Amino acid sequence: MAGGSEKSVFLKWSWFLEWLTPDRATLKHIEDVIFQGRSRFQEIAVVRVSGEGKVLVLDGKTQSSESDEFMYHEALVHPAMILHGSPRKVLILGGGEGATLREVLKHRSVEKAVMVDIDETVVNVAREHLREWHRGAFDDPRAEVVIDDAWNYVASKAETGFDVVIADLVDPLEAGPATRLYSEEYYRMVKDVMNPGGVFVTQAVSISHLTEYHAIIRNTVARVFKHVESYGVYVPSFDSMWGFVVASDDKDPRILGDRGFFETRLSHQLQGAELRFLDYASMLHMLNIPKMYREAIAREKRYATLDNQVFLPA
């Protein structure tokens, strides 16, 4: 689940103005407002947008769109799951729409998937209005939905022994609830609830519009895990190449670029489950970030701690 910004506005509920950066915005035509409300944590809306279908909007920021959510969620979930090879127990941090859970449960080895989201209202709205996203995943007997703060859940070690941890969190905005969830301290706590040989993956903001912030997330993860790799995919509803960071102490993510490795594991793990976006060609493309972004990522040396937090521009 990406995003979160106060600089977005519905104009007479006909047009949706969304700021991607302080100097870049998109304008989308709204056909219908399906749901609008507020939880304890954020403004929530489900709208129908021309050319995109249903769109989940939190605090004025697009989280995912019916037309292309599968691109984001398949890209977030499957590389980490394939890298591990046979994950039995998976932790999802965030992911209130249920689509991340949906993708995790496609893997034949999964015996239990725990989804932790702070906002019960978002989960309930998704259950009712975003069935195209979760497709019944909330009711799968392997799924457990926990309403809790992702920091508290991990810090308390309410459960351990996870093979894969997937962070599908809102962006680290200064006024937002997720900033500390991108810190070195948090990533170390996450590692403590993982099994040896586990794999961690996080959404890591826009590579094309917020390159330095993607690099900071990568650098922070790299202080905790031995092997770290960035990858990205252009998501039309985000108008951006969206970034991800995958990491492990034991498994080098670059092996995902090996065709035999990738296709053998994908076929074994999914056993015919439908993927609309991800195959070997797409994986190879995601790993090959354009040169100018790779160079910018390499130049950035900052990382985030609780005492030295880095916020996205509001």
From Swiss-Prot:
Binding site for S-methyl-5'-thioadenosine: 42, 117, 149-150, 177
Cellular-component GO terms for this entry: cytoplasm
Pathway listed: Amine and polyamine biosynthesis; spermidine biosynthesis; spermidine from putrescine: step 1/1
Residues binding spermidine, per UniProt: 73, 97
Keyword list, A-Z: Cytoplasm, Polyamine biosynthesis, Spermidine biosynthesis, Transferase
Enzyme class (EC, first level): transferase
Transmembrane parts of this sequence: none
Reactions catalysed according to its record: S-adenosyl 3-(methylsulfanyl)propylamine + putrescine = S-methyl-5'-thioadenosine + spermidine + H(+)
Localization per record: Cytoplasm
The EC number(s) this enzyme carries: 2.5.1.16
Span of domain PABS: 13-249
UniProt superkingdom: Archaea
Active site per UniProt: 168
Gene Ontology biological-process entries: spermidine biosynthetic process
Gene Ontology molecular-function annotations: spermidine synthase activity; thermospermine synthase activity
Family in the record: Belongs to the spermidine/spermine synthase family.
Function: Catalyzes the irreversible transfer of a propylamine group from the amino donor S-adenosylmethioninamine (decarboxy-AdoMet) to putrescine (1,4-diaminobutane) to yield spermidine.
HAMAP family: Spermidine_synth
Self-association and partners: Homodimer or homotetramer.
NCBIfam families recorded: MFS_SpdSyn
Protein name listed in UniProt: Polyamine aminopropyltransferase
